[in-house]
Amino acid sequence: MFTKRDLLQQRTSIDQLKRHNSLSPQSAEMLGQSIASSWQRSASCAIPKERLAAPLLAQHNKAKTTLDLALEACSNDLSHIAAQSSMVIAVGDVGSTIIWTASSTQMQSAAEKVHFIAGGQWAEEEVGTNALALSLKTQQSSCVFSNEHYMESVHDWVCYAAPVIDPYSKQVLGVVDLSTTWKNHNTLGVLAAERCASIIQTALIEQQRQRLYIRAFA
């Protein structure tokens, strides 16, 4: 666990790194190469400084994907995790658009304010550095702490994300993100995101098993 002093010191260090126009190799190593690279990509995207929420895309009726169907099967489990952990859980598609969320009462208002809801477009080119987009970019688990985020309105957040991998094709189908306030930062956050990704992947396996069963007796 981190103390409040540890976390405040981490925020101060990040602010100091942000003041430099270019990151030295030592600074990039301190920050983490994936975050440093994301900052550089974000800076080149001409994201409006006044942007405080992700663009919100209209949710049109469309055919359900395998990820949508898997979420229907495991949404109760994920919602329970969100409620018990004082977090908001979001699942995004491969384009960084959120397709499903469940939120604790503690995070609901904050999530709605920044459009961390279904339809929110969290691609780096829209909102800059964030864990959801970073995990899709690197195809690895990620953590973005407080002011490591590009958009100032989520500097009070810490976010953990993990890609959702198709257990059969091994392709990335989407991403799951767990977010809470920076004061609740925990070293187990990334493991929790990976656990949620595993829950979705188990639902994908069961979904495929049911399809094969139906096909066998059709």
Regions found by a protein language model. Give the residues of each.
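Short glycine/serine/proline-enriched coil/turn segments at secondary-structure junctions
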Residues: 151-154, 168-169
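A short beta-strand signature within small-molecule sensing/ligand-binding domains used
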Residues: 154-163
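Cytosolic beta-strand hydrophobic patch enriched in CBS
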Residues: 90-91, 163-165
